[in-house]
């Protein structure tokens, strides 16, 4: 375990100071975790072998201290209806979101216009949606060799964390998504027994502009995913052209497919490199699947 102390963060400055922001020492964040790696190599015959390696890591954190003048915590990121907030006793990356207001029976409320009612953005009204960071990361590499052929692949996985589909929210809010179109064709949308006009529902709960107070709870997904990260298939041409040189040719494929994911986008997406915006899809380019050829000549 380790403690990270005196991290610098930008917070709003008092109005009378004439400044927009000031920097503070945020306090003390305690990290606890472990990592281990285990490997195995087996030569089954003179021509066939297998090697494997598994890497596993776990990390959790807790905010032990914050500066005294932040009674509502430190907001790292505020986008529309979601905030990443640091609170004493909480965790780095805790996500709080606006949500549909409901009655005592769990049914969504609507105003006199027939629009769903979305909560405010004060700490008392926001709903805790989970933590943005995955607690468990895993990678598993395997290599098989038979005579001059080789096959290797890497499977990696992340367990836990949250991602936000802001692209999805915007398309809903603008009324151009598949689901909003289907709702219009169906004459409305029913949510937990309450029927809404499709346009009124999605314009309110979706993100019709990037600062609108939409119901982010509808667009938060589990970031858990397991993917085939890389596959390499190669062959070694020995004593090439009788010159005593070997040429290894390998076909490489990366980001081939997911074995499992809950989010409609790649959970590794990020809206930028700043604090609190990892795991946010904001019209990001789709993750590419790539193929390549590698040639290696040994003298």
Task: Tell what function each PLM region has.
Residues 10-21, 115-124, 204-217, 271-277:
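Flexible, solvent-exposed coil segments and beta strand-coil junctions
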């Amino acid at each position: 375990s380790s403690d990270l102390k005196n991290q610098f963060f930008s917070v709003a400055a008092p109005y009378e100071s004439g400044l927009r922001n000031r920097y503070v020492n945020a306090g003390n964040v305690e990290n606890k975790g472990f990592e281990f790696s285990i490997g195995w190599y087996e030569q089954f015959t003179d021509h066939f072998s297998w090697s494997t390696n598994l890497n596993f890591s776990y990390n959790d954190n807790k905010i032990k201290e914050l500066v005294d003048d932040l009674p509502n915590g430190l907001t790292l990121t505020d986008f529309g209806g979601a905030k990443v907030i640091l609170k004493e006793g909480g965790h780095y990356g805790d996500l709080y979101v606006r949500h549909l207001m409901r009655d005592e029976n769990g049914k969504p409320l609507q105003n006199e216009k027939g629009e769903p009612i979305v909560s405010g953005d004060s700490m008392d009204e926001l709903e805790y949606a989970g933590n943005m960071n995955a607690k468990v990361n895993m990678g598993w590499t395997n290599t098989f060799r038979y005579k001059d052929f080789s096959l290797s692949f890497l499977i990696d996985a992340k367990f836990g964390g949250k991602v936000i589909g802001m692209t999805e929210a915007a398309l809903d809010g603008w009324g151009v998504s598949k689901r909003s179109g289907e709702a219009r064709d169906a004459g409305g949308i029913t949510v937990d027994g309450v029927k809404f006009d499709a346009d009124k529902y999605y314009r309110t709960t979706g993100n019709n502009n990037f600062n609108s107070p939409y119901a982010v709870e509808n667009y938060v997904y589990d970031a858990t995913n397991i993917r085939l990260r890389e596959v390499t298939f190669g062959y070694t041409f020995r004593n090439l052209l009788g010159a005593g040189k070997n040429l290894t040719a390998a076909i490489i494929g990366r980001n081939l497919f997911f074995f499992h994911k809950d989010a409609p986008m790649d959970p590794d997406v990020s809206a930028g490199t700043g604090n609190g915006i990892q795991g946010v899809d904001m019209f990001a380019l789709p993750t590419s699947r790539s193929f390549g050829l590698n040639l290696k000549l040994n003298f």
